[in-house]
Regions:
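C-terminal membrane-solvent junction of multi-pass transporters and transport-like membrane proteins
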Residues: 97, 101, 181-203
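Hydrophobic membrane-spanning alpha-helices of multi-pass integral membrane proteins
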Residues: 103-116, 163-167, 194-212, 235-237
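Alpha-helical transmembrane segments
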Residues: 168-172, 240-247
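Membrane-embedded transport module
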Residues: 1-182
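Small-residue-rich transmembrane alpha-helices that serve as helix-helix interface/gating elements
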Residues: 225-239
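Aromatic-capped, Gly/Pro-kinked transmembrane alpha-helices
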Residues: 144-151, 186-187, 213-227
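Transmembrane helix-loop junctions at the membrane interface of multipass transporters and ion channels
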Residues: 44-53, 121, 208-225
Length: 252
């Protein structure tokens, strides 16, 4: 290590930046692997059931852009935190994917899979033209209904696709808060965070809006009403709320 200003404070800053970068990489892996677990299992279940894939190839391409490009932009741009200096030194043999990360990856990923599987089953056996008509009773009734179905319409496919994207959108906040021991809102409105994390969030929402509105046959989607957008945003919000609640409990 080179002391550039004849002071050991430069070494401290270098360690802080190094630890913060390591945590940002962990956050990115946490988010990316959670999406991978969910997307892979959803597609595999559709294949084993002999039905059309819940997510089309072009839709998966957009999900991959969110997972790789925008998530990397959002999480890699998070500024260093002095809190990392309070942590114990890490062993060279330590795995970058820790046990808490593994639990969160598979726990959240499998939850997303179970939720999306239920939605696919529901839309296969119900003729849905608006999410205002969504019935939890029918959702659970059709969960294990493997009888011949009427298939999934373009609008219902759009619901599945958009719900999946917004599940990842809110989970991106949980990935940001990983290791921070605080709210995902902490430092969210700093200029450097807005320039990276905020921009990525905007691109995800704006991109999804444009795809649903103008994607048509290319993405196998249909335009949704403003109410449907509201239901999806609010319906997927508990992913973030539960994450915030769990972080608050850990602080107690």
């Amino acid at each position: 290590i080179t002391i550039i200003d004849n002071s050991f404070s430069s070494i401290g800053r270098a360690v802080m930046w190094g630890r913060s970068l390591y945590q940002n990489i962990q956050r990115f892996l946490l988010f990316q692997l959670t999406v991978n677990v969910a997307a892979c299992f959803i597609v595999l279940i559709g294949a084993f059931m002999g039905t059309e894939s819940p997510l089309t190839v072009t839709q998966m391409l957009w999900v991959n852009l969110i997972m790789d490009t925008f998530a990397a932009l959002a999480l890699a741009s998070l500024p260093p935190s002095a809190m990392v200096m309070k942590e114990k030194p890490r062993s060279r043999e330590a795995n970058i994917i820790t046990k808490p990360m593994m639990w969160q990856i598979f726990g959240v990923g499998i939850f997303f899979v179970l939720l999306m599987f239920g939605l696919v089953q529901y839309f296969k056996h119900a003729d849905v033209t608006s999410l205002a008509d969504f019935s939890f009773a029918e959702y659970f009734k059709n969960y294990f209904n493997f009888k011949a179905s009427q298939g999934i319409s373009a609008l219902e496919q759009t619901y599945i696709f958009t719900i999946f994207v917004f599940l990842q959108f809110w989970n991106l906040f949980n990935a940001k808060a990983f290791h921070s021991e605080g709210s995902a809102f902490k430092g969210l409105f700093r200029k450097d965070v807005i320039a990276g994390f905020g921009l990525a969030l905007f691109v995800i929402v704006a991109g999804q809006l444009l795809i649903v509105s103008f994607g048509g046959e290319m993405f196998n989607v249909a335009a949704m009403s403003a109410k449907d957008w509201m239901y999806i945003v609010l319906g997927t919000l508990p992913v973030f709320i539960i994450g915030e609640a769990m972080r608050m409990v850990k602080k107690l």
